[in-house]
A protein has these predicted regions:
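Short, cationic motifs built from Arg/Lys/His that form the positively charged side of catalytic pockets
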Residues: 1-5, 12, 62, 66, ...
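Intrinsically disordered, low-complexity regions of eukaryotic proteins
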Residues: 5-7, 30, 90
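Short linear sequence elements within intrinsically disordered, low-complexity coil regions
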Residues: 15, 55, 118-120
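Positively charged, aromatic-enriched patches within helix-turn-helix-type DNA-binding elements
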Residues: 35, 41-47, 51-89, 93-102, ...
Length: 126
């Protein structure tokens, strides 16, 4: 994993603060602006979809249980079957919106989800 600050130069030599960006393959998340692009094209996500994608990308390779995601993203305690289905529906919609790149979100049967990427992973401005 490479970490790097990306700074924008302004007239007079002043710089803006580092832009925090997560990239995996063709997916890019600008954390300051809370926006996502795939192959450079903006993707409209709900707040929960954005938070799910960010959590999955930040913990790439780790299996995240439905219970963990419900607590982290929704603030719920013990998950019920209905709550667990909420995660499944949001993941399904997120995959659809990401198109072919949605295939990087893998289901781990009876547990949860994992973001798997076979490309170079870069995290800027940590």
């Amino acid at each position: 994993m490479n970490e790097k600050d990306v700074k924008t130069l302004h007239p007079g030599g002043a710089t803006s603060p580092p832009v925090r960006t997560l990239r995996a393959g063709a997916i890019e998340i600008n954390l300051q602006r809370s926006n996502v692009t795939v192959h450079g094209k903006p993707i409209k996500l709900t707040t929960k979809e954005f938070e799910l994608l960010r959590e999955l990308m930040e913990t790439r390779g780790e299996v995240l249980s439905r219970e963990f995601l419900l607590e982290k993203i929704w603030g719920y305690g013990k998950a019920s079957e209905v709550d667990s289905r909420t995660i499944d529906v949001h993941i399904q919609r997120l995959r659809q919106k990401l198109g072919a790149e949605g295939g990087h979100i893998l289901t781990v049967k009876n547990v949860g989800y994992r973001f798997d990427i076979f490309y170079n992973w870069i995290k800027f401005g940590a």
